[in-house]
Amino acid sequence: MTDTTILQNNTHVIKPKKSVALSGVPAGNTALCTVGKSGNDLHYRGYDILDLAEHCEFEEVAHLLIHGKLPTRDELNAYKSKLKALRGLPANVRTVLEALPAASHPMDVMRTGVSALGCTLPEKEGHTVSGARDIADKLLASLSSILLYWYHYSHNGERIQPETDDDSIGGHFLHLLHGEKPTQSWEKAMHISLVLYAEHEFNASTFTSRVIAGTGSDVYSAIIGAIGALRGPKHGGANEVSLEIQQRYETPDEAEADIRKRVENKEVVIGFGHPVYTIADPRHQVIKRVAKQLSEEGGSLKMYHIADRLETVMWETKKMFPNLDWFSAVSYNMMGVPTEMFTPLFVIARVTGWAAHIIEQRQDNKIIRPSANYTGPEDRPFVSIDDRC
């Protein structure tokens, strides 16, 4: 037992954190994911994230979450073929995207694109599991198309063809972004990153999706709500801020000196610590290796060395460990991903987890309606309007 966790009936309970509302309070049951049961572990449907990230393509993990099992090779090939065929955008969705200004927040574009798709290809009445899975697959396949169709049209007037022959979601994203097939190394890096971001239990956006699903609403509405929650800087965007921090400096020494001063001044350094993990973020060790490999291949280790030095500084000064976002920033930057697309990439990965939770919440078939602790005044006498001061 540590000062941060307690064990009750063999169940790991997180000691509440003052900065996180409802921290440590169970809000429902799930068979999809466990986070931090031992302080630094993560499992999707019982599988260790380290095994999944090491051995699986992202599409395997998407199938695990959305369809309930790791696919056989034949099932994986069929699933990837299905996703390839779903990358296109209906004409009216493209029209909506063309109307959005270049200054739009990419997360607003994602939200709007999903809403337009939901109007064009609405969920059928009855809300079947198979129908929800089909919508999840359509979104998984076409979110990159939504983002990058808007991006290229709004920035240079180009109407790209969103369908490519790339074998993976990550490869499709990079191909649409850069206009050419990515290297195998970049595609592998995307597989790993998307796997790491795919699911994370009852985080704010996932819980939002479950609350909406619990009302009996459609899949699109639940996903749109989740995107809205992830847009908030207290939930999404940490890897964007992480890169901004890393890019302030020219050398690791400069970075260390400045961050030590900021820590002394009690400034918050984004990219470190976690509301649930108490020992380490298990995803960190994986993405750090990816960041180093990409940096070495790109012939530029500057950002990696700065990030690595600050990892040491934050542990020495605050005993705070880096989370997934810290070296994801380095990885995405080395693949030429614009900073404003970091959180939309989070959406592309997490739509798999959101969809799985929506389906699970529907099967529970209960509306989520918690109580509140009232903190207002009691038993106030009513004063008519003419007598009020």
Swiss-Prot record:
- Name of the protein in its database record: 2-methylcitrate synthase
How is this protein annotated for GO cellular component? cytoplasm
Q: Keywords of this protein's UniProt record, alphabetized?
A: Transferase, Tricarboxylic acid cycle
Residues where CoA binds: 268-272
List the effects observed when the gene is inactivated: Cells lacking this gene are unable to accumulate propionyl-CoA.
Which PROSITE patterns does this entry report, sorted A to Z? CITRATE_SYNTHASE (PS00480)
Q: Which residues take part in binding substrate? A: 82, 200, 283, 350, 369
Q: Name the Enzyme Commission number(s) assigned to this protein.
A: 2.3.3.5, 2.3.3.16
Q: What does this protein do?
A: Involved in the catabolism of short chain fatty acids (SCFA) via the tricarboxylic acid (TCA)(acetyl degradation route) and via the 2-methylcitrate cycle I (propionate degradation route). Catalyzes the Claisen condensation of propionyl-CoA and oxaloacetate (OAA) to yield 2-methylcitrate (2-MC) and CoA. Also catalyzes the condensation of oxaloacetate with acetyl-CoA or butyryl-CoA but with a lower specificity.
InterPro entries attached to this UniProt entry: 2-MeCitrate/Citrate_synth_II, Citrate_synth-like_lrg_a-sub, Citrate_synth-like_sm_a-sub, Citrate_synthase, Citrate_synthase_AS, Citrate_synthase_bac-typ, Citrate_synthase_sf
Record: active site: 235, 274, 325
A single MF term (Gene Ontology): citrate (Si)-synthase activity
Q: Which reaction does it catalyse?
A: propanoyl-CoA + oxaloacetate + H2O = (2S,3S)-2-methylcitrate + CoA + H(+); oxaloacetate + acetyl-CoA + H2O = citrate + CoA + H(+)
Output one GO BP term. Answer: propionate metabolic process, methylcitrate cycle
Top-level taxon: Bacteria
Question: In which family does this protein belong, per the annotation?
Answer: Belongs to the citrate synthase family.
Q: How does it assemble?
A: Homodimer at low concentrations and converted to a larger oligomers at higher concentrations.
Pathway-wise, it operates in:
Organic acid metabolism; propanoate degradation; Carbohydrate metabolism; tricarboxylic acid cycle; isocitrate from oxaloacetate: step 1/2
